[in-house]
Amino acid sequence: MLTRKTHRKHPPSVRVETGPAAGDDVDIRTRVLIALRWTAMSKFLGQLVSWTVTLYVIRILSPEDYGLMAMATVPIALFYLLNTAGLDAVLVQKRELSDQLRAQIFGIVIVLNLLIFIVFLGTAPWIAAFYREPRLTAIIRILALQFILLPVETLPQAQLEREINFGRRSIVELVTIVAGSLMALTLARAGFGVWTLVWGSLTTTAIRMAGLNLIQRSLCWPRFSLGGMKTDLLFGRAATVDRALRFALADTDRFIGGRFFGNTLLGYYAVANDLASLPVNKLTGLINSIALPAFARAQSGPGGARAALLTMTRLMSLLAFPFFLGISSIAPEISTLLLGPKWQAATVPLQLLSLVMPLRMLMNALQPFLWGVGRPETSVSIFLIGALSMPLAFLVGAQWGPVGLSLAWALAYPVVFLVSIAHARTLSGVLVTDILRTMERPILASLLMYAVVFAVKHYVAFGQSEHILHLASLVLVGAVTYIGSMLVLDRGACRESSEALRAFFGVRPYSYDPRPLSKNDETPLAGH
């Protein structure tokens, strides 16, 4: 099932009365890597089922169905991010968590979610009128039922994250994904149209809530009091503002697009955006987990923050640029073979959006880094830059439909990325040129890969374009070209990424020490 992917509320790694003692670092690293292997395996199985069903459902449903769902999920996704007032981060990260505080947070979350549900019941007709689409009233009211269920999963989910217990949680996620996908498949085949996506989303929420409570008994009687919570509420406010700004940066495109060009054209854009952006969440989580110890050591010595940030950027660039430029290079084949003829209008948006996804992935990883070194206000100010800039670009781009909206991403976001990196310079000690140097060789190798795939498609007889073997052959050509190019351009970076991935899968230990910068990479620290 392909619905709007909301930002998962991973608590920021801020260290205010939080976290383990320094002597526990080795144990935590081991637990994180073991837990993440569980997560990787379960997510692989779950996503295999999910993507198979998703592609099948896309072929059945219409662009209009996906456009309606995209319109409805814009306000739902926003309040999903805000439904705990940031206090879920307190549950995970506060070192001394009393039963009274847990009960108080639970009470606040219950009240807040009930208020959100009531607000949606009343405002659904107004939202539908804004989009000039009466069918949205019923869709939004049904989707709002999630806010009755969400409070019940807050405590068990936070406890599992607090204990870094990804193993049991990954089982719940696997069951949830499979059940939601099967529900979507059943409803799509029965001709439910957009309600396939609506009820699929509700099914996913309900099963996840039930599963989390079965494996982690954390519920308690709520306490409806704010006494002694001033510090926690201020921390939650910072997390909430951060999430709201990220939403304004990344999700106002659908809000504006739905108003300007209606549900059918928005459906093409929404599917293209979801196909391009869904891997961002998976790859970001993987690389962040590998770089986690580097973040923990970011302030351990001179240049530590700089080294950690450059290591993270280098590892992400090695995977992100070939992956997403590869999607862009074969977007026509993806549309034809996997989505079907009625989705041809999604081809160009998919090509354009894929080009900018590596930068979005790097920006997403910058936020936990800044929280990890104790500067959440810098993270907020960085996302404020994008939250003010990107909606203006979307307003201009929406005049030319889905392609214009995609161009707004492709042209404006690189500028936002560079400005944001420059803004973070005083904290990280990393110049914009430092970041660009870590990205330079993966970008060059990826562009060469793009050119080779383009040439093979257009100038070499390489099978029939409507056959899956043709697509597989193009993927193979691209992979061989990129790997070969990187072995020539930067063999050391390839070795580093290989060791990190082998450590992740338990093949051998990995020191997590950033490789020494070569004289070609080295530049003076900012402010030195």
State the predicted function of each range.
Residues 35-50, 176, 197-200, 204, ...:
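Transmembrane helical elements of multi-pass membrane transporters/channels
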Residues 29, 90-99, 149-172, 190, ...:
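Membrane-interface junctions at transmembrane-helix termini in multi-pass inner-membrane proteins
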Residues 2-18, 44-48, 107-132, 137-138, ...:
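Alpha-helical transmembrane segments of multi-pass membrane transport and lipid-handling proteins
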